[in-house]
């Protein structure tokens, strides 16, 4: 089923190739320090065990920021979705010079954020906040790309790509 092009295999030219999917791209920018998903906490009150999520207000703020950027009326996305998340973390003071150079970034200051919070917990927060706001369920996400970087302005940038055949 693959066509040969001067002795080489051309993988992009299958005889009964499906039409290329159409793609819709939606971008969100949420200002503020990215929030990682935290584990629920348990407590004992008498003989009853209870749980609480210490993070509900932070998730609510993120969900509201995302919802405000959607057009009205909005229909929840369906189908295969690719999500690209870029988490920009605040730089610590140790990345900057001292004295008159206190606003100058050191030459050896790293670009990528390699400490906590973990990137998977940052993703979980974004996915949970997009459930029933942007898409119906995060099970429709077929590909996810994420990165953590340092920045002077902490924020979360989310790109959602929806693929539809036809």
PLM regions with names:
Residues 1-166:
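Acidic, proline/glycine-enriched N-terminal capping motif
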